[in-house]
């Protein structure tokens, strides 16, 4: 659920944007946009000419020249207004985040445990590694990891989602964000950042976008626009000697008007606004992008790597069955599985403990009282377990346990292989339990594929995007779930190294890869991916490696991220097509008007039957300014997007924005010409 959306033309934002538009008239600000800088120079030049004409220092129609000059300044102001309005919307979103930051005190613990003595210190003095206690009603003072306890947390100030979430030590839900509120119970938190480096601080800095850099495609388009501007500038400059040689030299004011109408001012004036609005729309989806480059890359993505758990399935795998090996009692298997899971804080581990209680009334035992050593799960070993007395119990993936058994001189039973295959073919995940070198049996973990996910993958396939499911399950389980979900491919028994290798393989083929992640083990792959969406509930390492953060911690959001990225690219392309098509119509308005006196044959091009040369030129300049304002909503909201193939989208946009770009100026210029004539202004 997103926070409240701003109205497109919020009155306070419009007023502020108008002020900023005037401030941006300074040369330093204009220089950043070469196309509009040419318009700015033309405005300055025609203003000087108008003043000279009015004072009698130059011959000519001072009123006409002043009208042209005024509308050129308005053109620059409208372009500035579009950019300022987009920036203002982003800053307003940043200000809403700043409201989350509150001056508060924290209870800094002297020892890293609940009940230890605490000192009351200002929250902004907490450093990385400090341990704090937060209880019901408290604001979490820093970003960190829960090391003890569990609590219900209200994260609506950050995510906009009203439903509270559970944060607890261990597992995937241990990360907390400063500025959120504890609703119940208590947490002991280890701060993971220093002051000024919190997630909220980085969010605000990213959203404000003060250092927004142009993306590669934006730079390429700017170079194209500069090239077109130079071509039209040279062409316009050569027209004066031609007209002078014909005996009726065209005025500098008319030449400036011609140049401004021919260069791509529409897209030139809206280009920055489109980029800023793309990042703003991403925030509207509760995704923070670190740069416009990340948003743009999302639009070019053609491979999606999707974690099975939480993205394709509901992500709440639960132990559903104990399947003992031949010669092993089911209760013996359940007892060993529970012992191996006593210190396992993952949902799967806890479900194993609960299932053993339910089936055989095996009460949970304390690891410390048993004088046992817990062996945590790692991405490399893909096992966890416990060492107690002379017993060494492990649970983990089939391959990991097989290697463990063989390394200890044992043999992996064929009947267990059959049981593993049976569980996997049912779409469940098999975990194998072993004591020493003796395999005790299999635990079945069951998950459910999300409703409607198959249809979404079909849409992505239609857009030319390949979907790849990433899972730690064995190949049989992965194949069953992949077939049910409708993904194009899958990577089974995935390790961090395998994910990284797969991304590099696709990139070597010239593809752009997007993925999501939330764990420290995802960080290398997130850093390598072109679009890397880290979950807000994930670890600090994952957030730092990604170039986007999903505040809702919803892995399925990756599909929406791609949608927004493609919409931004389509908006830029559509308005570029519209802008260039505009020039053709303006050519038919100004060229006959400017040169008909010198070359009467050009009257044949006056297909719009405009009233007079002056009205034709002024109408084209007015239209050139007004079209920027009319297109601001489209630049900010983005063009309508549908999941189509690239060729189908190109045809659609050429018809709508190419043909529209030709017809709209003909109609608009003719209407303005009629109004000027009826009102006696020309």
UniProtKB/Swiss-Prot annotation:
Effect of residue 307 to E/N/Q: Unable to form a phosphorylated intermediate and lacks ATPase activity
Top enzyme class: translocase
Sites bearing Phosphoserine, chain numbering: 162
PROSITE patterns found in the cross-reference section: ATPASE_E1_E2
Residue ranges, Periplasmic side: 56-61, 243-251, 596-612, 679-682
Post-translational modification: Phosphorylated at Ser-162, which leads to the inhibition of the ATPase activity.
EC number of this enzyme: 7.2.2.6
GO CC, alphabetical: plasma membrane; potassium ion-transporting ATPase complex; potassium:proton antiporter complex
Residue numbers on the Cytoplasmic membrane side: 1-33, 81-222, 264-574, 632-653
Record field: catalytic activity: K(+)(out) + ATP + H2O = K(+)(in) + ADP + phosphate + H(+)
Quaternary structure and interacting proteins, as annotated: The system is composed of three essential subunits: KdpA, KdpB and KdpC. The complex also contains KdpF, a small non-essential subunit. The KdpFABC complex exists as a dimer above concentrations of 30-50 nM, whereas the complex exists as a functional monomer at lower concentrations.
Function noted in UniProt: Part of the high-affinity ATP-driven potassium transport (or Kdp) system, which catalyzes the hydrolysis of ATP coupled with the electrogenic transport of potassium into the cytoplasm. This subunit is responsible for energy coupling to the transport system and for the release of the potassium ions to the cytoplasm.
Name this polypeptide is given: Potassium-transporting ATPase ATP-binding subunit
